[in-house]
A protein has these predicted regions:
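N-terminal glycine/threonine-rich, aromatic-flanked beta-hairpin/loop signature
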Residues: 22-42
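N-terminal acidic leader/helix
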Residues: 2-27
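Mixed-charge, Lys/Arg-enriched low-complexity segments
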Residues: 35-71
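Short non-domain terminal segments
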Residues: 10-12, 33, 49
């Protein structure tokens, strides 16, 4: 199962999506952003994220396997 992390300060949730990228979502507003594990932004309204958490969530073996399967 993919890792999901809730940021203790911002409240944003970080989770790996179906193609191995990290979806960052603000549960309060529904805004989101899609990033790779290095912090490169792909889409969405959110552009300012915690790069350390992107790495923790996006560099798991599960996330890597999804990226390889979808590339």
């Amino acid at each position: 199962m993919a890792k999901v992390y809730k940021h203790p300060i911002s409240g944003f949730t970080y989770a790996v999506n179906e193609v191995g990228l990290v979806r960052v979502e603000d549960p309060a507003t529904g805004r989101y952003g899609i990033f790779d594990d290095n912090g490169v932004w792909y889409e969405g309204e959110i552009r300012d994220v915690d790069f350390q958490i992107l790495g923790w969530v996006g560099r798991t073996p599960e996330a890597r396997a999804l990226r390889e399967a979808n590339s």
